[in-house]
Amino acid sequence: MVAHGIAAWVAQPIRHALLKVAADSLIAGGLYYCSYNTLPGWLAACPLQQLAWLESRRRASGTTSAAQAVHAAAATLQGLLGLAETPSALAMALPGLRERLGSLKEMDSSYLVQEYINEGWQPLTVQDFHDSAMAHKLRYTASAALPDNFPGLLPVNIRDTVMAEADPLVREVLQDLAINQSFRRDIFSRGVDTLSSAENTALLQAMHFCLQEAPEQESYPFTTSFGLVNGNSNLYRSVETILADGPMSFAVLQDRLSLSIPDLAQVLSLLLHDGRVGIDRGEAGKAATSACNSVNKTLSRLQLNGRPYNFRAAAPIGSAVPFSIAEALLETAAENSGGSDHREALIKGLDALGRTLVDTPEAVMEAYQQRRYRLQKLELGRS
């Protein structure tokens, strides 16, 4: 079961009901994914949400939009921060608040309303939510943000303190505090883990991986919630070179690279996190191609009508890949006019949607042409 972006935006009784529904619906060993805003990362946003909610309530009978209430609250808070050279007590206590307020003008209005104009808005702590989940026999298993499962990737100055903690829940708390965690993507399992270590290893070694979108690069920096992680270029390039020949199992990769299971799991997790590698679904992926093509056709139509859908379903990996509105316009232009210049179609399409490019049309078209072959391998068709 999946509950993405719900738990921290609803009242406590509804949050407990979500957990109960998950627990009652899953068989033993079934998985429940739940993502939510968390503390301490959202502390700086608390004053903004408080004022935005009050502003929206005060303006409820007027004609201004809910998004305007958020911007009005932000303007008021700016006046409470003082100057950068002479910050107020609030600005010193919440140094991230000024930057957050400055970023609002770049955010979509629908997101601002959904995020801040919400009576049930309440960033959660990991210990409180995990305790609530355990009360429903939902046991924390792992983070869907794969790098978060490897505390050895933490910066050196905080790593030892986190890894020295033996209690799993306390270790999660320490990790969240150390990195100022703002959003968790937790996976829970129903009941107890019935797999032995040998069974877990066998399942892992049988998994197959494939090259996804992996343009050549000299270095391997990975942006994670721990900060920037720099991978060993020779090692990561070797993995991609092997996978360029086609999908490979974990066991084969381990043998060819002479890596331990934990080390290879970390390498693959970072490549998966960065979208350079995918989990190959084999025959199941082939069987899902037609359905994914149908979904992509609908997503394309909605995207071209201005809806905020910026991903496409990729059947071979059972996941989604980014696909911008500019790429959707160029894809449609190519289907309608073959190999002619699509610059005009791109510009007109963006103008009609009230959108602009951050780069030149020529650069965007060149990037799309370079990406088309990689996308074709992922079978991102529309039928």
Predicted features, each with a name:
Residues 1-16, 32, 38:
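A short SAM/SAH-binding and catalytic strip from SAM-dependent methyltransferases
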Residues 9-10, 40-44, 148-153:
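Short catalytic/ligand-binding loop motif for oxyanion handling, primarily in non-cytosolic enzymes
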Residues 13-18, 121-125:
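Short, glycine/acidic-rich beta->alpha junctions
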Residues 15-29:
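A short glycine-rich, Lys/Arg-flanked "PGG" loop and its adjoining helix->strand segment in the class I
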Residues 16-18, 46-55, 150, 155-160:
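Short secondary-structure boundary/capping segments
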Residues 29-31, 185:
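Extracellular structured ligand-interaction cores
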Residues 31-95:
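Conserved class I S-adenosyl-L-methionine
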Residues 84-383:
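Rossmann-like AdoMet/SAM-dependent catalytic core
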